[in-house]
Amino acid sequence: MKKFLIVLFILVQGLIFAAGKNLADIKTLKFDVVEKTTIKSKKRELSYKIDFMLPNKIKKEVTAPKLNKGEIYLYDYSANQKYVYLPMFNEVRESEIVDDENRIIKAINKIIEEEKKSKDFKQKYNAKVAQTLDIDKQISINIVTYLEVEGYIFPETVEIKESGTKIADVKISNLQINPKLEEKILLNAKK
């Protein structure tokens, strides 16, 4: 009976760790985001589409509110550069990425890193258990709900806290794994 329980335990553990594919195997992602922020009791909702070439290139196209619709942000974290297309002025602006914008990539990389190195995190993640991750000294994220696409598990609803105070809710939808992305658009933003 003991052997059966040990074998059963090993089998269950194997299934838990095999339940989701490794996030580190993903090369590209495409998804929609609704971000609801509250800063100093001011509420704002922003919707956008993300094209992400892992590990460090992101295209964000704003779909709402109407005032910002059509704005395109291209982030090249490897070069610490950001390009912003403003349709209202029909111009492209180039600047360095500021620390707040680095939190996106930090959060994604933190989840991938924790999935690789922490058995406890991976086990809870694959079981879709809500959990908290500290991104830096001020920012933490609470993964509230998960979604599963093509055998990969992703955070679906995330609360963002700054110094313990909730500042945003982020909801991901329409997730596509390894879609073909136009690399030239992400790499040659100024052209």
Explain the meaning of each model-derived region.
Residues 26-32, 55-61, 125-133, 152-157:
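Short, hydrophobic/aromatic-rich segments at coil-to-beta transitions
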Residues 49-109:
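An acidic-aromatic
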Residues 28-56:
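N-terminal targeting signals for Sec/Tat export/insertion, comprising classic cleavable signal peptides
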Residues 97-136:
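Solvent-exposed helix/loop surface patches that form functional interfaces
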Residues 4-13:
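Sec-dependent N-terminal signal peptides
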Residues 18-25, 36-38, 43-45, 66-68, ...:
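Non-transmembrane domains of secretory- and envelope-associated proteins
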Residues 22, 48-53, 73-75, 119-125, ...:
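Short, exposed beta-strand/loop patches in secreted or surface proteins that constitute
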